[in-house]
């Protein structure tokens, strides 16, 4: 049945192309139904997902920050904004999942349409605006989930500033969300790089960033791993400053990268849903167009740190080759979202199986041995 579904997946993508946000909402609702069925004693749906989409390989397991990752491929933030399908992501093969972005205050996000697929470019343009129900609502939802399910994969939460919060009050906003959600998650990512919250990306290059890091660490009584997610559009100099701040404030890692506001080289010239030139459309671009830049940023961070700061690599991962490239550049972990949309849920097991083949071909006994091998010995850029 699932093989038949895979053959139909391109048709499903085509049917949902005109309103991808509604299609995504239906996906999340379907996964919620699987969760509900499991809680009500009908475990067969969850078991079928596990059989179809998981790929166990001890060579791909990682231990980091005191957490055990069944494999190195995780779900990127932006997919499960509310944590509604948190219990189901392990059955779809992910080694970890990052929920959110979540803000202190509930917010509706930007006006629709705000999510667009660019199939010619294997990309997605989004200007959702961190629509979510707020930190308190997510905490209650996740507590209810974990009261029923034991966590089998690490769960991260992407923290973003509320739109209504002034930039000079960002510290308190992030700290509130962190303290509210710390009991129900394993690691946290400070999102200062989304292009869809006005002024947010300016925090990456302002005096507020060290204050945010310091405020979060002061509140981190749980000793949760704190990471920062950066933009692919930053200069090398700006990235170097962030690396220094990560070291100074003892952050646990860097997520590289978020979406891009650049539009160069796209095959899509006009956005069909609006009729406007793509260069004039606001939002963050993800998928294949940012693959190479994301890898360059990973390589730069690895070079500058000598591999001492774990990197979660994200941006344009569609195949095992894409994943392997980022591992070799210096990523210890990977995240996928746009590639999962275009390739379907089979992509996770395909990539994991392909990584295992890469390890065998290269004579590696474990994925950690391959991290940064294409970067080691090269002079920093």
Curated annotation (Swiss-Prot):
Cofactor: FMN
CDD domains, A to Z: DHOD_2_like
InterPro entries per the UniProt record, alphabetical: Aldolase_TIM, DHO_dehydrogenase, Dihydroorotate_DH_2, Dihydroorotate_DH_cat, Dihydroorotate_DH_CS
Residues engaged in binding FMN: 77-81, 101, 158, 191, 229, 257, 287, 316, 337-338
UniProt GO MF annotations: dihydroorotate dehydrogenase (quinone) activity; dihydroorotate dehydrogenase activity
Catalytic activity: (S)-dihydroorotate + a quinone = orotate + a quinol
EC number: 1.3.5.2
Highest taxon, organism lineage: Bacteria
Active-site annotation: 194 (nucleophile)
Gene Ontology biological process terms from the UniProt entry: 'de novo' pyrimidine nucleobase biosynthetic process; 'de novo' UMP biosynthetic process; pyrimidine ribonucleotide biosynthetic process
EC supergroup of this enzyme: oxidoreductase
Residues binding substrate, per UniProt: 81, 126-129, 191, 196, 258-259
Subcellular locations according to the entry: Cell membrane
Membrane topology term: Peripheral membrane protein
Keywords: Cell membrane, Flavoprotein, FMN, Membrane, Oxidoreductase, Pyrimidine biosynthesis
Pfam families membership: DHO_dh
Function: Catalyzes the conversion of dihydroorotate to orotate with quinone as electron acceptor.
Annotated protein name in UniProt: Dihydroorotate dehydrogenase (quinone)
Species per Swiss-Prot/TrEMBL record: Synechocystis sp. (strain ATCC 27184 / PCC 6803 / Kazusa)
